[in-house]
Amino acid sequence: MLEFEQGFNHLATLKVIGVGGGGNNAVNRMIDHGMNNVEFIAINTDGQALNLSKAESKIQIGEKLTRGLGAGANPEIGKKAAEESREQIEDAIQGADMVFVTAGMGGGTGTGAAPVVAKIAKEMGALTVGVVTRPFGFEGRKRQTQAAAGVESMKAAVDTLIVIPNDRLLDIVDKSTPMMEAFKEADNVLRQGVQGISDLIAVSGEVNLDFADVKTIMSNQGSALMGIGVSSGENRAVEAAKKAISSPLLETSIVGAQGVLMNITGGESLSLFEAQEAADIVQDAADEDVNMIFGTVINPELQDEIVVTVIATGFEDKPSSQGRKATSTGFGSSVNSSSNHQSGASAKEDSFSAHTSHSQSSESVSERSHTTKDDDIPSFIRNREERRSRRTRR
């Protein structure tokens, strides 16, 4: 079912909360990148680390419990610290329509406090999305075990959860890539997610989308796949749609999604046929009875480029079996497995915004991997062609 939403676009209030060292670092890098219409909040037990935060709002939690000295890699301390400072957290969240809670799982403050913060946000009526990372395999079994428990706690607290296994970073960066540059790739998952949704609800379109549409697709769904794809030239609509639903950081496939919010932004040359082409790619990959809400925006600044933003939910939580070989710009997917599945994709994510230049060089997969012709075709595309072939034979 394809629904077209038209009407007035209400600008919702978005807040991004970084919890613990990893979350605070992610927020700092987002602020450095520059984002509008978003409020940033940093939460930590470590007073010294909190002083380094660039967020406009800073909350030192558990001052009585930890005396500003951190949680000592103990999630239980992080949890109790957040519970001690509940009123301060509530005051900071007040007025938010949507809250992103980001943290690194495996340590003390992020693992223990982030689920408490997320639960408070959801109880206050905000659409709550968790974006967390799993530790690298070399960080040890104890940290992995604590991270798995933290992910489970986050799942129970948020509307949707996006998990980024840090081990995936090893698949999308070169051996010579500096560590801080590699971590920026993980931060892009959060940044592009916030930017994509902010653009969806802040920019009026020919076929309009607003925060109510985002909430319809993401509320109480447990799992979410979100992505942005950009392309230009011949077959730009198809290529942008493929990129939006494929990412080297994804562990969950769009296959079987029952709810999809899709927006296409293009220049004045964007045609109805191109919009249909892009929608077909996404719709055919999702469940056959998908509830698809579709919007379009004309932005003359884009000229020959097309930007496709996709939010998909309501699919079974299982790791994707397809090896993603296409260059992609998707910015994250929720997972419900503690195991780290190695991705076959090797292209770096690009950073895209509907208001800025979208070109960023990336090494093509054809230069970095050797595949057969069939392997170059995503499995959902092959499945679509097989379904059409069977219908024709009938």
Swiss-Prot record:
Its main location: cytoplasm. Keywords: Cell cycle, Cell division, Cytoplasm, GTP-binding, Nucleotide-binding, Septation. The keyword Phosphoprotein does not apply. One of its GO terms (cellular component) is cell division site. Residues 328-346, 353-364 have a biased composition (Low complexity). One of its GO terms (biological process) is protein polymerization. Pfam families: FtsZ_C, Tubulin. It is found in: Cytoplasm. Residues 317-394 are annotated as: Disordered. Residues 365-388 have a biased composition (Basic and acidic residues). PROSITE patterns: FTSZ_1, FTSZ_2. The keyword Heme does not apply. GTP binds at residues 21-25, 29, 108-110, 139, 143, 166, 187. One of its GO terms (molecular function) is GTPase activity. SMART domains: Tubulin, Tubulin_C. Gene3D superfamilies: Tubulin/FtsZ, C-terminal domain, Tubulin/FtsZ, GTPase domain. SUPFAM superfamilies: Tubulin C-terminal domain-like (SSF55307), Tubulin nucleotide-binding domain-like (SSF52490). It comes from the Bacteria. Homodimer. Polymerizes to form a dynamic ring structure in a strictly GTP-dependent manner. Interacts directly with several other division proteins. Essential cell division protein that forms a contractile ring structure (Z ring) at the future cell division site. The regulation of the ring assembly controls the timing and the location of cell division. One of the functions of the FtsZ ring is to recruit other cell division proteins to the septum to produce a new cell wall between the dividing cells. Binds GTP and shows GTPase activity. Belongs to the FtsZ family. This is Cell division protein FtsZ. It comes from Staphylococcus epidermidis (strain ATCC 35984 / DSM 28319 / BCRC 17069 / CCUG 31568 / BM 3577 / RP62A).
